[in-house]
Regions:
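Cytosolic regulatory regions of ion transport systems
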Residues: 1-455
Length: 455
């Protein structure tokens, strides 16, 4: 697939980081030569200096042969014009634009986005999506990620198994899932180091530090977590590092959360701090050096339940999380923009990594993948994806059993939603019209699974 990306800042770079893992021909256009040089050192891309909204530039990069344009510069107008040019002059079939300004996002103006006005197939707001992902962790304290499916009726969530004294540690996953069935839940996958275990074997037992993925009706999430020794202790005290769109959206939502007692934002840039403070009511915004003992004390860092580092600097985010991890009761969360810091981040105790590329790409997966996808999430770089597949009466899959699908060995149908019933880790089930399938797809199997569930 030929993909043209407009913008080489953090959002554009994060997209390249994920898309470069596939068999894609990627062109990156930006006016900043230094940013292009930086991204070209790390990834196999074609860097082009110029404005993505310029017709001459689009022609020079072969836009006529492009399968997709993703315009993610920091200028909304440039992104929208780029999509218009790509459609009108070059007939690009799929066009995605980053839009941050609220006036462009107002539902009243949704009719702007069509072929007769602004031909944009999908509008994305990466920073807001990151903030929403972070807020999802507040709904299920102790989790590493929460992925909502079926219009919010089902969650697939992950957590690290730290407690080895629970009864479940003595039993096979087959036995555990028989118990979880009482809550209409199931363990659907385990990540052990870099090895993924799909739950289709009888003799699999939990080990300490396994990352466990559970599918569960939303209302039973907390009860299931408790069975694995994870107590539901709300994040009452929050400290966020970095004044930006992510921290603003998070803080504004947390101000209305009855479980939150205090929220502080620390920002080293005085102007940014003042600007953020003007738009918040209950949040304490503190300007000063983020590593300063006095600033950390003013923010209540030592007693925080959760520390969220979302600055634009990966090193700062990791240092903050390293400090937070010294307090065993503080959950550390760090935003990572570059893959080179992932390994370091995983070695920080109590640290949850938020990979910008993974969150950003999740928002556009249903446009990237050639399958009938309602919802899709990337789990991490080279960790695969989870798709919600919808099956209509014209689907060739209707009437087949799960075995008949001949799923690749490293991918699996995790769950089926039929009527009001959840069926987990199915094998002999016969697919019916209007069933919804939750499918794990390994990175190497994406094309094969696309063929199985082709639109």
């Amino acid at each position: 697939m030929k993909i043209v990306i407009g913008g080489a800042s953090s959002v554009g770079k994060s997209l390249v980081g994920y898309l470069s893992l596939g068999n894609n021909d990627i062109v990156v256009v930006d006016k900043d030569a230094a940013k292009l040089e930086d991204i070209a050192k790390e990834y196999d891309i074609q860097p082009v200096k110029g404005s993505i909204s310029n017709p001459d530039i689009q022609e020079s990069v072969g836009m006529k042969k492009a399968d997709m344009l993703i315009a993610v510069t920091e200028n909304d107008e440039v992104n929208l014009v780029a999509c218009q040019v790509a459609y009108t002059l070059f007939g690009v079939p799929r066009k995605i634009a980053r839009v941050d300004s609220q006036y462009f996002l107002n539902p009243l103006w949704n009719k702007l986005y069509n072929e007769k006005s602004l031909p944009v197939d999908l509008v994305i707001t990466p920073d807001i999506e990151i903030a929403k992902f972070l807020l999802g962790l507040y709904k299920l304290p102790g989790s590493m990620a929460v992925y909502p499916f079926l219009n919010g009726n089902l969650n697939v969530f992950s957590f690290k198994q730290k407690d080895t004294d629970i009864p479940f540690m003595k039993f096979s996953l087959k036995h555990i899932n028989s118990k979880l069935a009482e809550l209409s839940a199931a363990v659907v996958m385990i990540l052990r180091g870099n090895h993924r275990i799909l739950v289709n074997e009888d003799e699999v037992y939990l080990q300490r530090n396994d990352v466990i993925y559970i599918a569960c009706p939303t209302e039973s999430n907390i009860d299931v977590m408790r069975l694995f020794g994870v107590d539901h202790n709300p994040y009452e005290k929050t400290v966020i590092f970095g004044a930006n769109a992510i921290s603003y959206y998070m803080s504004s939502q947390l101000e209305n959360d009855d479980n939150v007692i205090s929220c502080s934002v620390v920002e080293s840039n005085v102007d940014k701090a003042h600007k953020l403070a003007e738009h918040l009511n209950k949040t304490s915004v503190i300007a000063g050096k983020m590593m300063s003992d006095r600033i950390l004390e003013d923010a209540g860092f030592s007693s925080a339940d959760i520390s969220v580092a979302v600055t634009e600097n990966d090193k700062d985010n990791l240092l903050i999380s390293l400090l937070a991890s010294k307090n065993k009761d503080t959950q550390a969360v760090s935003l990572i923009n570059s893959k080179e810091y992932n390994l370091l981040a995983t070695n920080i105790r109590n640290n949850t990594i938020i990979d910008r590329s993974v969150i950003t790409i999740s928002g556009i997966l249903q446009y990237l993948r050639r399958a009938r996808i309602n919802e899709a999430y990337a789990l991490g770089r080279e960790m695969g994806e989870i798709w919600e597949i919808r099956l209509g009466d014209d689907s060739s899959n209707v009437g087949q059993s799960i075995k008949d699908l001949q799923m690749p060995e490293n991918s699996a149908v995790l769950a089926i939603y039929q009527g009001n019933e959840f069926i987990y880790n199915p094998t002999d089930y016969q697919i019916k019209e209007d069933d919804k399938l939750i499918v794990y797809v390994s990175p190497a199997d994406i094309k094969a699974v696309e063929r199985i569930f082709y639109r």
